[in-house]
Structures are given as structure tokens and as C-alpha cells.
């Protein structure tokens, strides 16, 4: 996963629509079968401070293959850590609230340069 990297990859995301999610209000878009590809980028802490996005595989995403995940309020979308996904700007004038939770396998290695951690953090 780009933002919650583990070795081996184990991140799963749960995205719950608190309101209907449509193309107009910024629903998620995803690449069918994209979870079968390699990780393309990784967000990590830089030595000396700050964070950076590094490229692991420079092959561009084929955005024309992405499909909208329009869902009704209460729907839970489960996202594999390697699945390319994004949302576009909300152009509707109404909100699109969602609740997201991510989980990783405690047996996977969570590198010390992952961006999400505190100096005393031990999540695994």
C-alpha cells in the first residue's frame, strides 16, 4: 500500500459511505484488477525529516480503465492495499462524508520509515 506499506503487503481498507457517493460529489474510482499489479509509489519519511513520495514502478496508471464506485449510504467498499483508487473533486454543492479504516497484518513488517508513526509508536 502506498501510504501504509508493509512487507509483505497486507493493508486492507474499509471505506463506509455515510452519504450516497456519486460521480458528482466525488465518489471513489478504482482500476478493475488493479490489485494484481505491483506497488507503484510509496509515501515515506525522509532521513533528516519530512516526507516524500518515491516511485517504485514508473509505469503510468491507465486512467481510462478506472471505473466509478457509486454507492448508497451505508455501503462498505473493501479496498486491497495494491488497488489503485482515487476520488475527483466534489462538484455537486453537497457533501460526501465517509468513514475509512485500514488494517494491516501484525505478522507483516512495518518499516520504521513509514510516514504514519510517532517516535514511541509500536503498532505491531
Predicted regions and their residues:
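Double-stranded beta-helix
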Residues: 21-83
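Short capping/connector residues at structural and topological boundaries
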Residues: 2, 8, 17, 33-36, ...
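Short, P/G- and charge-enriched loop/turn segments at secondary-structure junctions
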Residues: 1-4, 64-66
Amino acid at each position: 500500500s502506498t501510504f501504509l506499506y508493509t512487507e509483505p503487503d497486507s493493508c486492507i481498507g474499509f471505506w463506509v459511505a455515510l452519504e450516497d457517493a456519486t460521480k458528482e460529489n466525488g465518489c471513489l474510482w478504482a482500476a478493475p484488477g488493479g490489485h494484481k499489479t505491483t506497488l507503484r509509489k510509496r509515501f515515506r519519511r525522509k532521513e533528516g525529516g519530512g516526507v516524500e513520495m518515491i516511485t517504485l514502478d514508473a509505469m503510468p496508471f491507465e486512467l481510462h480503465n478506472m471505473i466509478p464506485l457509486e454507492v448508497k449510504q451505508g455501503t462498505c467498499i473493501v479496498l486491497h492495499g495494491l488497488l489503485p483508487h482515487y476520488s475527483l473533486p466534489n462538484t455537486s454543492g453537497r457533501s460526501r462524508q465517509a468513514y475509512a479504516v485500514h488494517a494491516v497484518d501484525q505478522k507483516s513488517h512495518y518499516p520504521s520509515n513509514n510516514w504514519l508513526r510517532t517516535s514511541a509508536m509500536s503498532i505491531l
